[in-house]
């Protein structure tokens, strides 16, 4: 990876105060390298500039670290190339992550890179439709999706995969009306416990993370 990648990664980690040590940074770099290598043959990401990838894929995934601090298991729904699950597993080596996606070639990458990096990540080629046992998916302490940003769609689906006491997370490209988030959670017996708004430090793109827990 080039100097721009390292600068963007370091700047994002430092600006957001993320607990990422040197060993984790090395794993993140190897993941990014394999992602771009596979992407030449398999369409995994539209972002191919290393610095942009560092910020918009890696740093943006790692923003979840404080919100999953107490989790032992995490389910990443619609994971694509393993985002945010694999970056989180690079930092939280104790975290058991399941990445699921309906596109088999993307899960083939998830499996290959996780084995190469010796991460506690399992890839499952299935479209999550709310039937964890039938789909071979776990009920997890933390359930997240970057792919399904619409809370009206995501909350009813994600709630079905929550373990007792678990946290449902939505990564949003913008701040959403809090009342709408409250209502989406209440319909599933969940309470909105946080709506954190932040800005990516290089691109200044606005982001938000919403969190729900069962009442």
From Swiss-Prot:
UniProt enzyme class: transferase
Location (main, coarse): cytoplasm
Gene3D superfamilies referenced in this protein's UniProt entry, alphabetically: Vaccinia Virus protein VP39 (3.40.50.150)
Molecular function in Gene Ontology: rRNA (guanine-N7-)-methyltransferase activity
InterPro entries associated with the record: rRNA_ssu_MeTfrase_G (IPR003682), SAM-dependent_MTases_sf (IPR029063)
This protein's record includes keyword Cytoplasm: yes
Keyword line: Cytoplasm, Methyltransferase, rRNA processing, S-adenosyl-L-methionine, Transferase
Catalytic activity line of the entry: guanosine(527) in 16S rRNA + S-adenosyl-L-methionine = N(7)-methylguanosine(527) in 16S rRNA + S-adenosyl-L-homocysteine
EC number per UniProt: 2.1.1.170
CC per GO annotation: cytosol
SUPFAM superfamilies for this protein: S-adenosyl-L-methionine-dependent methyltransferases (SSF53335)
Compartments in which it is found: Cytoplasm
Record: residues binding S-adenosyl-L-methionine: 78, 83, 128-129, 146
PANTHER family: S-ADENOSYL-L-METHIONINE-DEPENDENT METHYLTRANSFERASES SUPERFAMILY PROTEIN
Record's function text: Specifically methylates the N7 position of guanine in position 527 of 16S rRNA.
Family: Belongs to the methyltransferase superfamily. RNA methyltransferase RsmG family.
Protein name per UniProt: Ribosomal RNA small subunit methyltransferase G
Organism: Anaeromyxobacter dehalogenans (strain 2CP-C)
Record gene name: rsmG
């Amino acid at each position: 990876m080039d100097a721009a990648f390292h600068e963007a990664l370091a700047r994002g980690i430092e600006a957001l105060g993320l607990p990422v040590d040197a060993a984790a940074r090395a794993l993140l770099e190897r993941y990014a390298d394999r992602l771009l290598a596979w992407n030449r043959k398999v369409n995994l990401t539209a972002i191919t500039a290393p610095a942009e990838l560092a910020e918009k894929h890696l740093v943006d995934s790692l923003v979840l670290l404080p919100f999953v601090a107490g989790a032992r298991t995490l389910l990443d729904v619609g994971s694509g190339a393993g985002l945010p699950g694999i970056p989180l597993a690079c930092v939280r080596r104790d975290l058991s992550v399941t990445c699921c996606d309906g596109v088999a070639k993307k899960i083939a990458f998830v499996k290959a890179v996780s084995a190469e990096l010796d991460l506690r990540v399992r890839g499952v080629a299935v479209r999550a439709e709310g039937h964890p046992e039938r789909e071979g998916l776990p009920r997890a302490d933390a359930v997240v999706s970057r792919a399904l940003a619409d809370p009206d769609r995501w909350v009813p689906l994600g709630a079905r995969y929550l373990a007792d006491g678990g946290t449902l997370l939505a990564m949003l490209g913008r701040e959403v009306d809090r009342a709408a988030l409250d209502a989406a959670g209440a319909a599933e017996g969940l309470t909105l416990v946080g709506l954190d708004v932040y800005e990516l430090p290089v691109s200044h793109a606005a982001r938000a993370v919403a969190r729900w827990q069962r009442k």
